[in-house]
């Protein structure tokens, strides 16, 4: 019988398996199986030969079954051997991996035409070769590379992500090096990594200017991630410290959203919008536009709202002049959180002010109006020499003065300040040429209060059916009557509305009513309280809609909440914040119904200013 005939019935590859790949025991067993299979095949051939009549059919089937069994056993053995071989290879790879020597890392400094590279590693600058699988032309300066035990570059990594923070002073003429200032004002020259070199071709500002995390061209003052040992700067780090203090937005507040301040709105539009919209006329008349505006007055009367509306209106008007789409109008409203500018480290507050104005100038140079709004201006720019626990104002105020009208001019930048203690702001800031325009935001009178109420009580609000019936279902007329009635109640000089009796230093006495301390914020609070009562009424009775009684009850509750707020410890300071100026106040007595007369107290020298209204 031929070799091919002997191999029939065995798995592929079995016939070629010899002692070279199997142990001696396995080879002997395979040889025995071969001989037995050959013998069985020979018996089978004899059984089906010319003398097959002497064999029974059952013997033939038994032989065939035995051959099949041997073939299956042979196949199973081959699978086991293959699996064992694969496991052996995997274990060998694991042993080789665990036995590899440690790899080092370095920073790529330069590449050369002969496929060698300069690498900084372990404090040394070395010229190394690269593995054949490394594309030297694709390597970038400043990139991290992995080295084997023979100091051959075997893998390219990313740029370093940790290191020291340094401030960029200037980029040198070659464009690949920069002067940076590190810890303790230490100056050093560093190389710029490839991403920073490529940033030279980017626009000077991102589309959203104050999104400092977006790629843009480097400029002095930027914070850079630096590896001082390798001498490389890898990345520009966004200045979160300034972003926390500056809120950049295009406000959505318009003049139509402000009630009761028509005269003040006209004043600020004349001061801010006219110079931007009619530059030619101002130039023809040699008229210099104002550099700043001060909004002062009692709390809650709309100073911040007006500042936001200025930015919104100015952006739209500029878009109209340029022929742009008003919906895409752009202006920048920098809302400076005044108290957060203060820092315990000497010079930090001044540095923040410099950065804010530097960035405002850069954006304004493109012709886009920039409004810098200082809220609570008295907190950081108070009169020099009046500090109790610190003298920080002696350096902060001069910094602002130099920014507003120093050697560097302010073009397309308007400074708006807001304060309810304008008497505490340094006079040098308030003089003409700095904050030129001073606009007093007064407390609303009855007419202004009706205008403010109309902003919150609109015709789309649900009104109770009984109130609508009185006006034959005319919703507009019903709302108007509600406003008139609630304003009459709020501004009536009746005993229920008496608030305080003040005694001046000259002995004169004056009764003050709640209307003397009204504000836009209080009116909004009254309306919100009435809406809450209407909601509770729906839940309790099922009757839906706002009623005039809800508004009247809200006025009573609002007045009751404010009866304990006047500061009787130092009434003169309290009166200044509340908007009452003039003769010095020495006594305050609350006149709210049900309040005892023991609340009267003389002014004394205590430094505690107490609760302000």
From Swiss-Prot:
There is a cross-link at residue 595 (Isoglutamyl lysine isopeptide (Lys-Gln) (interchain with Q-Cter in protein Pup)). The keyword ATP-binding applies. Pfam families: AAA, Prot_ATP_ID_OB_C, Prot_ATP_ID_OB_N. Residues 612-613 are annotated as: Docks into pockets in the proteasome alpha-ring. This is Proteasome-associated ATPase. ATPase which is responsible for recognizing, binding, unfolding and translocation of pupylated proteins into the bacterial 20S proteasome core particle. May be essential for opening the gate of the 20S proteasome via an interaction with its C-terminus, thereby allowing substrate entry and access to the site of proteolysis. Thus, the C-termini of the proteasomal ATPase may function like a 'key in a lock' to induce gate opening and therefore regulate proteolysis. Belongs to the AAA ATPase family. One of its GO terms (biological process) is modification-dependent protein catabolic process. Pathway: Protein degradation; proteasomal Pup-dependent pathway.
């Amino acid at each position: 019988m031929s070799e091919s005939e002997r191999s029939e019935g065995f798995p592929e590859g079995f016939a070629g398996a010899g002692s070279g790949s199997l142990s001696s025991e396995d080879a002997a067993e395979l040889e025995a199986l071969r001989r037995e299979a050959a013998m069985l095949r020979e018996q089978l051939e004899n059984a089906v030969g010319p003398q097959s009549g002497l064999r029974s059919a059952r013997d033939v089937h038994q032989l065939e079954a035995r051959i099949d069994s041997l073939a299956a056993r042979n196949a199973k053995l081959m699978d086991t051997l293959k699996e064992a071989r694969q496991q052996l290879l995997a274990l060998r790879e694991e042993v080789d991996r665990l036995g590899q020597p440690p790899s080092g890392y370095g920073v790529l400094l330069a590449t050369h035409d002969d496929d060698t590279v300069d690498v900084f590693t372990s404090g040394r600058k070395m010229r190394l070769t690269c593995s054949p699988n490394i594309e030297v032309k694709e390597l970038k300066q400043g990139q991290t590379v992995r080295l084997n035990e023979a100091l051959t570059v075997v893998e390219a990594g990313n740029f370093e992500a940790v290191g020291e923070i340094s401030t960029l002073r200037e980029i040198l003429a070659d464009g690949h090096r920069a002067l940076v200032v590190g810890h303790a004002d230490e100056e050093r020259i560093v190389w710029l990594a490839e991403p920073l070199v490529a940033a030279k071709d980017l626009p000077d500002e991102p589309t959203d200017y104050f999104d400092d995390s977006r790629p843009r061209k480097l400029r002095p003052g930027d914070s850079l991630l630096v590896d001082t040992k390798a001498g490389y700067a890898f990345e520009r780090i966004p200045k979160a410290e300034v972003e926390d203090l500056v809120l950049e937005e295009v406000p959505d507040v318009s003049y139509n959203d402000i009630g009761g301040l028509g005269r003040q709105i006209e004043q600020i539009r004349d001061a801010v919008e006219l110079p931007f919209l009619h530059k030619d006329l101002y130039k023809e008349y040699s008229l210099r536009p104002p550099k700043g505006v001060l909004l002062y007055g009692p709390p809650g009367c709309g100073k911040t709202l007006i500042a936001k509306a200025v930015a919104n209106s100015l952006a739209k008007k500029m878009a109209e002049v340029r022929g742009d789409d008003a919906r895409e109008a752009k202006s920048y409203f920098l809302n400076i959180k005044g108290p957060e500018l203060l820092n315990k480290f000497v010079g930090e507050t001044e540095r923040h002010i410099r950065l804010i104005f530097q960035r405002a100038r850069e954006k304004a140079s493109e012709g886009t109006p920039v409004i810098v709004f200082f809220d609570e201006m008295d907190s950081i720019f108070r009169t020099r020499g009046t500090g109790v626990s610190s003298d920080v104002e002696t350096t902060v105020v001069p910094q602002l003065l130099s920014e507003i009208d120093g050697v560097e001019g302010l073009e397309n930048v308007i400074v708006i300040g807001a304060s309810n203690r304008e008497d505490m702001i340094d006079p040098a800031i308030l003089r003409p040429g700095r904050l030129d325009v001073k606009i007093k935001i007064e407390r609303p009178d009855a007419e202004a209060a009706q205008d403010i109420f109309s902003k919150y009580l609109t015709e789309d609000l649900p009104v109770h059916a009984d109130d609508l019936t009185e006006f034959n279902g005319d919703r507009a007329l019903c709302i108007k009557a509600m406003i008139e009635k609630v304003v009459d109640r709020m501004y009536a000089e009746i005993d229920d509305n008496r608030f305080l009796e003040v005694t001046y230093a000259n002995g004169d006495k004056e009764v003050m009513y709640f209307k003397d301390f009204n504000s836009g914020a209080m009116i909004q609070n009254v309306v919100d309280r009435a809406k809450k009562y209407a909601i509770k009424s729906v839940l309790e009775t099922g009757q839906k809609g706002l009623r005039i009684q809800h508004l009247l009850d809200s006025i009573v509750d609002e007045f009751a909440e404010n009866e304990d707020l006047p500061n009787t410890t130092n009434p003169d300071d309290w009166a200044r914040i509340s908007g009452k100026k003039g003769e010095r106040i020495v006594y305050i007595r609350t006149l709210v119904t049900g309040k005892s007369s023991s609340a009267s107290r003389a002014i004394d020298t205590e430094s505690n200013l107490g609760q302000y209204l």
